[in-house]
Design a protein with these regions (language model features):
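N-terminal membrane topogenic module
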Residues: 1-170
Length: 171
């Protein structure tokens, strides 16, 4: 039995021994959900720090202005969030193995989180392009990029809202 399964088992029996029958299931799932969120935050912080350090070094070495604007727009944070959510997606089976009916809920919750993070990543990339061309001071491209980026933001919000609804309802 792995570390997560044994820790989940300890939470399971602790709640079973210390709570009334009507509160056992909600508290077991709630505490295991807090465990999953704790793993997400720890993994996310570690990945953000690591990816930020690597991208900072890469930006300094390359002297590429576009990468510098991507670094300032914190594109690397969205990438770290995506990897953290994907890692937590793999942990669901080990943490909630005694509650198989809750798999679907937590899978949809994490998939919805991935949709939101991916939408934020797309928004940050569009902002990076806009800031890059504003810095280049190419007046015609600035106007075109601003119009395109605003259209992409509106279109992106609609598309990601639809995808989010599909993920939540399992369509």
């Amino acid at each position: 039995m792995g570390f997560l399964k044994s820790f989940s088992e300890q939470i399971h029996f602790f709640v079973k021994d210390n709570f009334t029958d009507s509160l056992i299931l909600p508290f077991q799932i709630g505490l295991k959900m807090l465990l999953l969120f704790a793993f997400f935050f720890v993994i996310d912080i570690l990945l953000r720090v690591t990816i930020t350090l690597i991208s900072r070094i890469f930006v300094r070495i390359s002297n590429n202005e576009f990468l510098n604007f991507a670094y300032k727009a914190k594109v690397q944070n969205s990438i770290a969030h995506l990897f953290s959510l994907a890692f937590c997606f793999w942990l669901i089976d080990d943490i909630f193995w005694r509650h198989p009916k809750s798999f679907t809920f937590f899978e949809r919750l994490l998939m919805f989180g991935q949709v939101l993070v991916f939408a934020m990543l797309a928004y940050r990339i569009v902002k990076t392009f806009e800031a890059y061309y504003i810095h280049k001071e190419d007046r015609y491209r600035i106007t075109a990029i601003k119009a395109i980026s605003e259209s992409l933001r509106i279109f992106g919000m609609v598309i990601f809202a639809i995808i989010g609804i599909f993920v939540i309802f399992g369509i």
